[in-house]
Amino acid sequence: MTIQELAELLHGEIIGDPQTDIRGIEKIEYAEAGHIAFIANQKYLRYETQTLASALLISTSHTPQRTDIAYIRTEDPYDSFV
């Protein structure tokens, strides 16, 4: 699945490459290339610059800190994730 396809399902806004391939979901601290993770709690912001995830699901109020991964913005990343 691509970020584009996932963003359409979640009604989210894409930041980055819409063709980024996603093959799994993982917690941000354990994610690897091909995974998507989410940031729904401020305490996980520290992982944003360290994660190996290919994409992150973030809130509409969050400003992405990286340009090498894709992001999907939604109103509630946690609800979108589950």
Located regions from the model:
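Terminal amphipathic alpha-helical/low-complexity segments used for targeting or macromolecular assembly
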Residues: 1-82
